[in-house]
C-alpha cells in the first residue's frame, strides 16, 4: 500500500471528522463531559489519532478499527459503546479510507457533504436521564400528598412518608433501611 498524498490525507481527515461528529455516542460523551473538562479537545484529537492509525497500519479490517475506536472511547471518555453503532462507524471509516486509496476523492467529498448536512439538519443527540425506581417512589409520595389536600392530609402524608423508612443498625455497623407496610 502506497502512502496517501497530502491532499488525499486531508480528504480522509475531513471524512473521519465528519463521521465522528455525526456519531451520537461521541456527541453525547462530549456534550456531557464524559472526557472531563477537555472533552471537545479529546474528540478533535480522536480524528487525528484515527487518521494516524490508518496511516501507520496497512490493510486494516473493520473489526480492528472498531477495537481501536472502542479503546479510545473507553480510555478517553470512560464510555463503553454497546448500542451497536461502533461496527457501523468502523465500517464507514474503512470504506472511506479505501475510496481515498483508490483515488475516488469526489465520492468521499460527496459523503462528507451528506454527513455535514445530516449534522446540521438533525442537531445534536441528547442524553435523557432514565427514571430510577426510587424516582418512581418519590413521584407516588408526591402524588399522595397532592391527592390528600388540606393541612390534615399533608400531615398524614408526611407521617406516612416518614414511616416508610425505618432504620435499624446491625452488629456489623451497617444501617438497614426497610419499608413498613
From Swiss-Prot:
Compositionally biased residues, Acidic residues: 134-146
Region span, Disordered: 118-181
Domain of life, per lineage: Eukaryota
Gene Ontology terms describing biological process: maturation of SSU-rRNA from tricistronic rRNA transcript (SSU-rRNA, 5.8S rRNA, LSU-rRNA)
InterPro entries on file: Pre-rRNA_process_TSR2 (IPR019398)
One GO CC term on file: nucleus
Known role: May be involved in 20S pre-rRNA processing.
Similarity remark: Belongs to the TSR2 family.
Protein name per Swiss-Prot or TrEMBL: Pre-rRNA-processing protein TSR2 homolog
Organism of origin: Danio rerio (Zebrafish)
Highest classification ranks of the organism: Eukaryota, Metazoa, Chordata, Craniata, Vertebrata
Gene from which the chain derives: tsr2
